[in-house]
Amino acid sequence: MPIVHPLEAITLDLDDTLWPVLPTLVAAEATLAQWLRARAPATATAFTPQARLALRRQLLAESPERAHDMSWLRRELLRRALIQAGDPPDLADAAFEVFLAARQQVTLYPDVLPVLQRWSQRYRLVAVTNGNAEIDAIGLGPYFTGCVSAHDIGCAKPDPRMFHAACALAGTDPAATLHVGDDFQLDVRAARAAGLQAAWLRRPDLKHETPPDGGAHADAPAFDSLHAMDAHLHPRSPLG
């Protein structure tokens, strides 16, 4: 489905759309591990990837209604790990803040800043994320009207309430709003189901699912960069 003008707002996913998230999370885990080794060595030893996965599964089984809240999951996971290792559980909040701060140390894709600068002069931009990246801490706040997060809304994509909240924040109708994201199900199809237009950003350095019909174009056009998407939106004045 082609993008229909006029557009009034663009909503953007964050992780794996504006930056690759895996290197960020790996670095944040390493920063947290170093902090734990200094302050809760027993937890640092026991807090292996396998232990984290087991605790995460336990938390999701106990509190499925909190599955959307990555910050709660991480904080509670740390608290449980500290208790199991015999370290003070009140270190959980400080440990979480260490992880959260490191999680904001992202490496933007090269096309992000020039395109955001341009789009922010034409459209209202709203971030839409299931994670706990913070646009102000990352330095992108000036380009955005605001951010809709699963933690704040109480649900996660593909729930249409995420997209409707973004449109409300932008003050636009869904039909005049374009959502941009890397995940075909959570971004493209979910946005279309919520009444928004959608564009699929398929970064070449990431693996992307193949839609059931073999292509995205029935739901949304696909692009390999924000530059390519911008050139499609504004064919007479593409970015250089």
Model-derived features: positions:
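Asp-based, Mg2+/Mn2+-dependent phosphohydrolase catalytic module
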Residues: 1-10, 22-23, 87, 113-126, ...
